Every structure is written in structure tokens, then in C-alpha cells.
């Protein structure tokens, strides 16, 4: 059975409810982070979706040197711990350097490896050594079958709890495209798959000093992923995306999230009751 046990009360994979990894791209203020986590959690509870709060304490791969990056690791982890304690949900956040793995694992239930860094062996091994669930985003430059090598590295490091995320493939300059064959291909490695609906509509560097995006297409891609078969969805969400300091053009407005998720859930339920064609 393809399933990853993230916490005592959360499993992702076969026989489990759809899971949503969601939150603002980067930690902004402490109050705003808690507000967003609470708002998304209420929607997920209403719809019967498992929820993991996502936000990055540091966006180390911003397009411009002048772009907002977030907070020092210690401050970001303190805020994420408040989300866990006060909202009562697991959290996922990125690590960019090997030395971050152990301290981040003390708070985060899932360590996320950014797409640009998915082949960095030392980073993968450090994450594997923590024993936490690891969500690896497939690089925009990788074929889905090449993620088998990433999985092999993690397994060699002792990782047993792995998630693999599709987030689009480079399609010329400043553009991404999704090859949905990647979902069953990566799932064949024996681990649950996640579809990142909002980064898949990103236009990397498309605004010169920042990335653009086409958030209006994210719901369509998410429905397609649900139709093919996916264990979790990744969606960045913001109260006011047009004012967000990072990835605003991609993010789903909070007030639209419930309406975005409802048809995705219907498709997911149908596919869960439909045999997969050989």
C-alpha cells in the first residue's frame, strides 16, 4: 500500500482523505500567519480534507536581491510552532541548506526540498537523517523518471517517509507546463504523490525582478491532477495575493479556496472508487 504516515493522526496515500498542503508562500507577520492557518483549517475541516499548514521561513531562491525573503530560521520556527500549538495542525516548511535540517525537524512535521535543490545529495541526506517526512519537489529541469535517483538517495540515508511533488516543467523561457504522466510515473516508486497547483502556473522571472503567474488556471490543473490520481494537493493561499510579498500572481485568494476545492473533491471521490486502467 502506498502510504506515508506523517504524524500519529495524519497519513497521506491510499485509503486516506485528500490532504491539502497550504498557506502563504512566505511567513509574513506572526498574526497574519496564524490568521491564514486558522482560516484554511476551518475550510478543510468543513470539507473533510486533511490539512498541513505550509509557509517558508526563508525564500532563499527569490529572483531579485531586493525581494522579501522572510525571517531568520529561529524566528520562523517559533511562529510555526505557534501554528502547531494554537491551530492544531501539522506544518511543512522548506530547507535550503544541510545545517537547517535538524533544527527545522524539531518543529516541522514535513521537511520540504525545493525543486531547484532536489538533486543536492548532502541536503537530501541531512533531511533523511532527521526521520521526518520529506516532501521533494521535482525539479523543473527533471524528467519524472529521474526522481527515482532522488528517492534512492533518500532511502540510502534512511528515509522511509517520502512524498514526491509535481510542480511543472520548464517550457521555454519564463514558462512551465505540466505533463500529468509524471503523477503515476512517480507514484510507481512506491510513495504518495502531491500536485502543486499554484507553482505549476508560475512564470519564473516573468516580471523581470520577480516571477509572474496565472492563478486563474490553478483550479483547472488541480482538477486534472485529481482525475489522474493524486494523494495530496499543494496550493499557496493568501488573503490578498496582489499585495503578497512573494508569489502573489500564483496564489489562490482565501475567499475563493472553498469554491476551488469543492469540485476537486468531487473528482477525487470518483477516482477513488474507479479502478485504475492498466
From Swiss-Prot:
It comes from the Bacteria. This is 2-dehydro-3-deoxyphosphooctonate aldolase. One of its GO terms (biological process) is keto-3-deoxy-D-manno-octulosonic acid biosynthetic process. It comes from Acaryochloris marina (strain MBIC 11017). SUPFAM superfamilies: Aldolase. Gene3D superfamilies: Aldolase class I. Its EC number is 2.5.1.55. The keyword Chaperone does not apply. One of its GO terms (molecular function) is 3-deoxy-8-phosphooctulonate synthase activity. The gene is kdsA. It holds the Pfam family DAHP_synth_1. The keyword Transferase applies. It is an enzyme of class 2 (transferase). The lineage of its organism: Bacteria, Bacillati, Cyanobacteriota, Cyanophyceae, Acaryochloridales. PANTHER family: PHOSPHO-2-DEHYDRO-3-DEOXYHEPTONATE ALDOLASE.
Amino acid at each position: 500500500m502506498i502510504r506515508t504516515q506523517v504524524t500519529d493522526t495524519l497519513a497521506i496515500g491510499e485509503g486516506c482523505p485528500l490532504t491539502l498542503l497550504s498557506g502563504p508562500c512566505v511567513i509574513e507577520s506572526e498574526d497574519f500567519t496564524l490568521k491564514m492557518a486558522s482560516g484554511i483549517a476551518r475550510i478543510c475541516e468543513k470539507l473533510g480534507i486533511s490539512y498541513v499548514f505550509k509557509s517558508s521561513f526563508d525564500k532563499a531562491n527569490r529572483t531579485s536581491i531586493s525581494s522579501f525573503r522572510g525571517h531568520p530560521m529561529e524566528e520562523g520556527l517559533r511562529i510555526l510552532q505557534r501554528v502547531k500549538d494554537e491551530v492544531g495542525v501539522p506544518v511543512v516548511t522548506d530547507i535550503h541548506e544541510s545545517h537547517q535540517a535538524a533544527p527545522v525537524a524539531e518543529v516541522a512535521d514535513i521537511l520540504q526540498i525545493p525543486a531547484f535543490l532536489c538533486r543536492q545529495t548532502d541536503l537530501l541526506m541531512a533531511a533523511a537523517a532527521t526521520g521526518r517526512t520529506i516532501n521533494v519537489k521535482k525539479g523543473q529541469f527533471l524528467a519524472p523518471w529521474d526522481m527515482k535517483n532522488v528517492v534512492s538517495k533518500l532511502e540510502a540515508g534512511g528515509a522511509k517517509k517520502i512524498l514526491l511533488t509535481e510542480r511543472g516543467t520548464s517550457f521555454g523561457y519564463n514558462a512551465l507546463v505540466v505533463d500529468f504522466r509524471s503523477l503515476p510515473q512517480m507514484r510507481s516508486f512506491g510513495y504518495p504523490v502531491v500536485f502543486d497547483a499554484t507553482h505549476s502556473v508560475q512564470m519564473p522571472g516573468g516580471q523581470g525582478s520577480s516571477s509572474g503567474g496565472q492563478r486563474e488556471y490553478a483550479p483547472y490543473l488541480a482538477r486534472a491532477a485529481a482525475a489522474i490520481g493524486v494523494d495530496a494537493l499543494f496550493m499557496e493561499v493568501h488573503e490578498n495575493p496582489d499585495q503578497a510579498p512573494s508569489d502573489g500572481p500564483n496564489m489562490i485568494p482565501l475567499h475563493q479556496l472553498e469554491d476551488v476545492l469543492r469540485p476537486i473533491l468531487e473528482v477525487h471521490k470518483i477516482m477513488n472508487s474507479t479502478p485504475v486502467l492498466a
